[in-house]
Amino acid sequence: MPTMGALHAGHGTVIRAASAMGPVLVSVFVNPLQFGPDEDLARYPRSLESDLVVAERWGAAALWAPSVEQIYPQGGERHPSTIQVPPGLQKHLCGAARPGHFDGVVTVVARLLDLVRPRQLWLGEKDWQQLVILRWLVAHLARPVIVQGVATVREADGLALSSRNQYLSPDQRRMAAALPEALHAARGDGSDPIPALRGSLSDAGFEVEYVQRVDPCTLQPCGDETAISLLAAAVRCGSTRLIDHAFLMTRQPLVAIDGPAGAGKSTVTRAFAERLGLVYLDTGAMYRSVTWLVLERGVNPSDGVAIEPLLKDLDVQLQSLPGGVQQVLVNGEDVSSAIRSPDVTASVSAVAAHRCVRQALTVQQKSMGSKGGLVAEGRDIGTAVFPHADLKVFLTATVTERARRRALDLEQRGFAVPERAELEAQIAERDRLDSTREEAPLMQADDAIELVTDGMDIDAVIEALVRLFRERVAEEAWPTPQR
């Protein structure tokens, strides 16, 4: 956990969260490369003895306070191997007002990663731009490090904890509470929040450096077309620079998980939804339900004309039972087990290919997801059902791996298990049918992230999905439910 010291309860909260995953090393280093010529490098709070007490109290295993010479053997004033952050990530927000600041941040963190070689890098969400940039750094350097963010910690009046808060006089401290108050008020009526927020901050006596609304992932300016956006401000309270932000949400988070048959989408999506407090929309179960009804009524799965009348009074209900069990009802009948039979599996691709079926179920699915707050899995969720989802993942695995999983699933459900070669052939044929059908073929959305799950157990896949989600949706915007 990299810090510049002057540790407080905000740092402590990050330490405590990280300590649940293993021993935590807290580094304390006031990095000269991230300070501008007229900034507060010389007077930045330094309190190593106090930092030791705070770090130990919150659960750190060790604290490391290296010298400038240890971090920058070739000199810290102008380090020869300074890393350049992409312009797009530092063109706005703090990067615009502090040229070179984030180049200095990534340079020191890269050095710390080289020297410490941690498994995880824990950071606060308070400086969201820095968190996004450090995620870029880890990917850019291809380091095997997991980046974890922790929600902003605030005082009782809403002021975000910061080491620089100690610069504030008592009067300035009272005034500083107007910053989070104004940000919170700006989230209200749905109009452009920037003019009103800028006015409120000026009226409160702040010198406003910037007020901007950006996409939390790209850090580019945005408006209401972005369902989840970051409204950020930097002000001067006396001589002290304060930053803060709020997340604006026109709807709750929406996640689309697509992939071929047998990739394990249902299992991991259900657990992922429960982990993050999202509703699980099992679209695959909906198509299987229609397929079951088609077979039950003796209709040819390839005959779309004969299937269409069955859809007029169709009532598919998905209900979550205790223990994460899903109950599927078709016109009031419990078909939870029946829709997983080999006969349904063999016919679902043909039934799902009919335009009338996809249109009927897509309308239902879009209605369910209109307010967000859910994760849906299927074949065309990110391309046809929820093309504006906040996170799109294409979850897949090799045919061999999917055949192995299918055999295990059939065995556990008490069905006969075909030879592995036959299962592989069935899965390959299902892939061909799904990807070549005329109506909503299986395909990876252009902005979806491919996640190949060979060699990953369920927990590892869920953790990967959670990390992808948190890169787009902050803990502060959508808190993880307490278990």
Curated annotation (Swiss-Prot):
Listed GO CC annotations: cytosol
Q: Name one GO molecular function term.
A: ATP binding
Q: Which SUPFAM superfamilies match?
A: Nucleotidylyl transferase, P-loop containing nucleoside triphosphate hydrolases
Q: Which GO terms describe its biological process?
A: nucleobase-containing small molecule interconversion; pantothenate biosynthetic process; pyrimidine nucleotide metabolic process
InterPro entries annotated for this entry? Answer: Cytidylate_kin, Cytidylate_kinase_dom, P-loop_NTPase, Pantoate_ligase, Pantoate_ligase/cytidylate_kin, Pantoate_ligase_C, Rossmann-like_a/b/a_fold
Q: Which family does it belong to?
A: In the N-terminal section; belongs to the pantothenate synthetase family.
This protein is called: Bifunctional pantoate ligase/cytidylate kinase
Query: Per UniProt, what is the name of the gene that codes for the protein in this document?
Result: panC/cmk
